Amino acid sequence: MIDRAEKNRIMQKSSDDGEFWMEFEDFKTNYDKVEICNLTPDSLTDDTKRKWEVSMFEGSWVRGSTAGGCRNFIDTFWTNPQFKLNLEDADDEDDQCSVIVALMQKNRRRLRKEGLDLETIGFTVYQAPDDEDHLGKDFFRYNGSKARSKTYINMREISERFLLPPGKYLLVPTTFQPHHEADFLLRIFSEKKADTLEMGNTIEADLPDPPMPSPPEEENDEEKGLRRLFEQISGSDQAISARELQQVLNGVLSRRKEVKFDGVSLNTCHSIINLMDVDSSGMLDFQEFKVFWDKLKKWIMLFLSFDTDRSGRMSAYELRIALKAAGMHLNTKLLQLLALRFADSNYDIDFDDYLTCIVRLENMFRVFQAMDQRKRGVVSMNFQQFLLLSMNV
């Protein structure tokens, strides 16, 4: 028992609020670990309360697009969400910047009822270049981390406190294994104001202008072969429908042994006609088809650069790079949606789905650019226009 004098000295008061006292020797006997919980990152001292600057982001790890796993999986690690942190001002006490990173899994208690347990999560911090775009595989292959979570662990939330020199940093939150899905909340606390942004958030297209009519040039052997096949299928009207286009493409592509595919679908051919049908006839004449053929050859070479094993498939995780090479930059949300739409159960995209994806995207970009005459990034349409646009893409 504690005598009255000792109680007065330590100002102990009996109240029914869960507080209790024990001797230190008893404490050491019964406990081997103490966790001090602080509801905010503010100072625990009696000094003047300091407000921390807070940045907060919500995101997702989605199979086939942003569930890249930890650094052990270098081929997909770079596809994880990336966040830029610009620390300009050092702390008041020294020339370093105090940063607290907290990564929380969302909705896991609800998902546990469905048999899904907590994912094993962590994060890594890199010195960042000035580039504002989503960084690719080579950056992480040749650059080491500056800080990281102490371990990957299956907890609802993990947090670490770092002292970093002023500069630009890249923060990559991940699950340990690739292809594991979860929603997350990322909070970044800093003593001084810091600029933060999610990388790869740009939506834009750098597409060549449609070719202008020009005097016919002498056709090479490839074009002569295309014309013969085109005229054979088109008949007297010298134009082909979507079904006839399917015959032409499957006939031509089947001769190219480097392209392994099961055939171009009718839906893909409808999308091609919507993109290339300049005169709105619902069909393609030979000049329109020839322009498309030039596009298709470039898209085939692009696909083959990712289909390294010549299986007729490319990894859905590389869709960001493939579309960028084709002149189209998409943000993380859109890439996640495309992976869900076009990737198979092995997170691969076959040639026909790749072609459908790239044709529809270019068509949508061109339609939007034509409607956005003031170049403000905003268009207005009524319900009928929306329906017509949706049915023609």
Residue ranges and their predicted role:
Residues G312-A316, I321, A326-I349:
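Extended, charged alpha-helical interaction scaffolds
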Residues M1-S280, F286-V291, K295-T308, R320-A326, ...:
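Accessory/interaction modules and long regulatory regions
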